[in-house]
Amino acid sequence: MRDQFISLALMLCILHSACGLYFHISETERKCFIEEVPDETTVIVNYKVELYDPRSNGFMPSSPGIGMHVEVRDSDDKIVLSRVYSSQGRISFTSHTPGEHVICMYSNSTAWFSGAQLRVHLDIQVGEHAIDYANVAQKEKLTELQLRIRQLLDQVEQITKEQNYQRYREERFRHTSESTNSRVLWWSLAQTVVLVCMGFWQMRHLKSFFEAKKLV
């Protein structure tokens, strides 16, 4: 019982954690990130673009002419979202298939900003972390206890989705392993048949050679 409680606590701590980072890109550069998402899970992407200022040797808030083209593809390589956003914003989408979702970003800057160095701040929130509970409490007029219960219910739901996703991955891995083992078996059988045929042909050829030389 204690081990189960510890495992549940660890899962709650690591489940769908937020990912905050920043990276540098040029005008034509494209950056992609892979996020493993269960099905029917909300993902929120917060971003902010800054433009390098050579006079101050630092990054400043970008001008309105610079935005970001954001493209999201699911595990079936289908486009979930693809559009141009402003230099700072919040993007939200819901996964409909479990698996790796690829989030790609690149600048839509014009020739005026060609070659400019950009810094992009990125924060990806998955699952319960994508829910603004303060806003939920205000809209639904929840008490502190009701809000806490709501959070726990959402956590349990996310754990269930994560467990289903892990079972999906295990099933897919098992199917891949069985397919690989089957191919290895058939390849081994094919090699055995080829070797037997070659041995039979060599024996026939050797027998014909001995008969031609009247050695047998």
Swiss-Prot record:
Residues 204-216 are cytoplasmic. SMART domains: EMP24_GP25L. Residues 134-164 form a coiled coil. Pfam families: EMP24_GP25L (PF01105). GO terms for biological process: dorsal/ventral pattern formation. GO terms for cellular component: endoplasmic reticulum membrane. Keywords: Coiled coil, Developmental protein, Endoplasmic reticulum, Membrane, Signal, Transmembrane, Transmembrane helix. Residues 30-126 form the GOLD domain. The chain crosses the membrane at residues 183-203. InterPro entries: Emp24-like, GOLD_dom. Its main location: endoplasmic reticulum. Residues 21-182 are lumenal. It is a single-pass type I membrane protein. PANTHER family: TRANSMEMBRANE EMP24 DOMAIN-CONTAINING PROTEIN. Eca and bai are essential, though not redundant, for dorsoventral patterning of the embryo. Specifically required during early embryogenesis for the activity of maternal tkv, while the zygotic tkv is not affected. Involved in Golgi organization. Belongs to the EMP24/GP25L family. This is Transmembrane emp24 domain-containing protein eca. It comes from Drosophila erecta. The gene is eca.
